[in-house]
Regions:
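Short, polar/acidic, helix-capping and beta-turn segments at strand->helix junctions
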Residues: 1-113
Length: 113
């Protein structure tokens, strides 16, 4: 299809399956996971049209944004950054999103002549 729904991603350490102590590393891990999911489905990060970030420590807003910006080459998708209670496995960030594949232009009736 032309739409991909990305379920909640956490930035967990692959060895421990817990959030790392380093906030920047966790932000990179969560965004790397989103990118892997998006690209494995044949989409690009720039196909994301909506992203929701749940954050258990809202003081990490600027840190997350600094990492987040590096994953997009065009404009940014619409985004909500929501302060939340405790997330599973000690995570500070949970990310979900919606990607829509850009459709190739179709030839109109004049092109069929």
């Amino acid at each position: 299809g032309d739409t991909l729904y990305v379920a909640g991603h956490l930035g967990l350490d692959p060895q421990t399956q817990l959030a790392p102590a380093d906030v920047e590393l966790e932000a990179r891990l969560v965004m790397d996971g989103v990118k892997r999911t998006v690209e494995s489905a044949g989409f690009r990060m720039d196909d994301l049209v909506s992203v929701t970030v749940f954050c258990s420590d809202i003081s990490q807003y600027d840190t997350f944004n600094r990492i987040y910006r590096g994953y997009f080459s065009g404009g940014f998708p619409a985004r909500a950054f929501i302060g939340s209670g405790t997330l599973v496995r000690g995570a500070r960030f949970e990310v979900l999103g919606v990607a829509v594949r850009a459709k190739a232009p179709t030839a109109g009736p004049a092109a069929a002549r």
